[in-house]
Amino acid sequence: TVLVAYPLSRRTLFGRDAIMIFIVFTMIFYGGLIPTYLVVKNLGMIDTRWALLIPQAIAAWQVIIARTFFQVSIPEELAEAAELDGCSDLRFLWSVVLPLSKPILAVLVLMYAVGQWNAYFDALLYLKSAALHPLQLVLRSILILNTTTSGSMEASVMVERQQMADLLKYSLIVVGSLPVLLIYPFAQRYFVKGMLIGSVKG
């Protein structure tokens, strides 16, 4: 995301407006579920972890957020001074831009991590081996297995099973939410600072 967003934030990049229009176009008009599945299948990524990582590797919304941060926070004069000192673009990005961009990097990591953590639909489509299933899909399968049909059970047994199913459901919600809740306090200051990009400064 950074390697796309930073060049788009520089005024010296030729055709950056056309590239941004293309990126926004992909955000508005999604290719669709079946074409995406066929691409993943033709690339040989079915039943591999790459099927979850590669299609979600870059998101247009995150590119726009990072580009805005770089435009607001990294002045053109800094890049010009580094260029006069003989600093290459990659060296400037690595040595100057990234250390100054901790807030937006924390925001991007948190957004990607939460998106991957909560996504089970892609795993449901692309992964056949149970060993590769992410935690959300495992929790979903446990929840489905525990749902019982009301057959010829006694009322007391049905009530007890329903209570166990509810208890399991609430436990799964806690297990699914806990990692994100543990990470958020450490990234909160960066997250708030990064999300206030472009706000009015007084």
Residue locations for each model-derived region?
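A hydrophobic, multi-pass inner-membrane permease signature
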Residues: 1-202
